[in-house]
């Protein structure tokens, strides 16, 4: 999984008011020291917007044996479907595009007013009918859902998007990738990840995609995660650190860690 193009402007902290004004400056050695201290001070330093650079990296990737790349960039963070098509043709690397929404800071303003069903329908359209960036040359369809972003303190719309993503995954059979926040601390991290997995499991139960909600030793954090993982396996999903997919075949699960 990788980002070939990415515009994280909406995720960056507010521009500093004090000099030096390096946020919009060209990426040169003059600002190297400042960027070592804080890489996110400069927009060019965090943008991935060069098709030429992406092509060079894909050529090196293929030379090393790579044949398939999953691009987890969503539309609001700079997804570029037409450029992905050009790169796939130029490098002979198969590129699979994702769909959905990342964390709330990157959401388009209209998303807050959308229902879970309508958000799921948007994802389904991109998987089955093609992305809005499609053109006369052909439909540009997503091949998986994600990466779906969930903040350390999850926003209500993020949780709605997560439930919608599960709904679309169950409807279409598409793999689902969730990108969790970096949460430090054993108990805090356990509760955070447990909450994400619980939402996924609950939504699959609601949709009739899960046959049983029990299982697992809940005396420890690892046991609790193991229990939820087994539930998802019973539903036909294999959950790893960054995503959920349908295993082939579906084998018995084992705990994380």
Predicted feature residues:
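Glycine-enriched alpha-helix->loop->beta-strand junction motifs that scaffold or abut catalytic
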Residues: 92, 172-175, 198-204, 233-240
């Amino acid at each position: 999984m990788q980002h070939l193009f990415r515009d994280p402007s909406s995720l960056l902290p507010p521009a500093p008011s004090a000099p030096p004004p390096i946020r919009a400056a060209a990426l040169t050695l003059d600002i190297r020291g400042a960027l070592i201290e804080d890489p996110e001070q400069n927009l060019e330093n965090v943008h991935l917007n060069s098709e030429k650079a992406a092509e060079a990296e894909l050529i090196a990737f293929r030379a090393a044996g790579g044949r398939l790349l999953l691009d987890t960039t969503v539309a609001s963070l700079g997804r570029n479907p037409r450029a992905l098509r050009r790169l796939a043709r130029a490098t002979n690397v198969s590129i699979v595009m994702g769909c959905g929404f990342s964390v709330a800071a990157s959401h388009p303003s209209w998303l807050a007013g959308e229902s879970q069903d309508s958000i799921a329908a948007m994802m389904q359209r991109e998987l089955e009918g093609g992305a809005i960036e499609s053109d006369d040359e052909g439909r540009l369809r997503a091949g998986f859902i994600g990466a779906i972003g969930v903040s350390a303190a999850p926003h209500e719309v993020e949780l709605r998007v997560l439930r919608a993503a599960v709904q679309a995954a169950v409807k279409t059979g598409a793999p689902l990738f969730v990108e969790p926040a970096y949460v430090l601390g054993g108990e805090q991290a356990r509760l955070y990840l447990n909450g994400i997995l619980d939402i996924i499991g609950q939504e699959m139960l609601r949709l009739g995609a899960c046959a049983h909600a029990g299982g697992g030793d809940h005396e420890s954090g690892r046991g609790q995660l193991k229990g939820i993982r087994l539930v998802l396996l019973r539903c036909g999903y294999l959950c790893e650190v960054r995503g959920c997919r349908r295993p082939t075949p579906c084998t018995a699960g084992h705990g994380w860690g």
